[in-house]
Amino acid sequence: MTMTTHVAGPPTGQLRLDGAAAAPRVHQAGPLTVIGLTVAATLSVFPLYWMVVIASRTNASAYEWPPALLPGGNLGENVQRVLDNSDAAILKGIFNSFVAAGTITISTVFFSAIAGFAFAKLRFRGRNALLIAILLTMMIPVQLNIVPLYRLMIELGWLNDIKAVIVPFLISGFGIFLMRQYTLQSVPDELIEAARVDGCSTWRIFRHVVAPALRPAAAVLGLLTFMQYWNEFFWPFIVLADPSNPTVQVSLKTLNSAYHQDLAQIFAGTLIATLPLAVIFVLFFRQIIRGIMEGGVKG
């Protein structure tokens, strides 16, 4: 009888006998993948590049055919014309939008994290019914709330006041649901029970255990919320009827109405309005990518 002995090699990822770690496997993208990603990136970036091209040229050259593909030398002049335009008041619009979007973002992330933690890890009477009620608010079209909200702003005397843009949107049903789902996936029950055994209160558990784990999701929610209310036009256009107290999107609408044939000035104003979003994305790039990747893996 013949016996054959098979000697298994070391499992993948273990240290070799010489002490060197096994090299990680690197998956290289094929040429079709590289070409596809290059085309997708070009299509995504080209509108921004085209905005810079038009904003840096004269109004006459913006209508030329074939169009110029390289930036001109009038960007500073066009930007200065936008800033000097008292009708558009774009600097005031940027300030109001930053205050409104920033306040709404901070409030949404904070309350969504707390409520998400409560719905995910705490046990209390009526929890499921309350969660369903919050989810149902997401199914109501925004347009149905316009008239009741507008009448409420009149009763409160908040028309032409930035509070009318901020207060109705301080809490988000979507944000609560997102943070609840992320808490369920990222924070084990055993970790919370261990903190309770150590004598931590519910607030300390949230602050020192749950909140650090929610940072990637908070970064994604914060960016989405800030972008949404930075780009919001319809509601501010209704409640901020005073042209001297606009948001940035209302300022761009005024600029477009007053100078509907001056594409260079309109695109220069659009470029100014886009810069804050670009800066915020660059500052929080790592947290945003981490949140998207972790959400994709855990989902």
Protein language model regions, located:
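A structural signal for multi-pass alpha-helical bundles of membrane permease subunits
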Residues: 24, 30-299
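Short, Lys/Arg-rich, polar N-terminal cytosolic tail immediately upstream
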Residues: 2-27
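An internal, D/E-rich "acidic patch" concept
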Residues: 1-6, 294-298
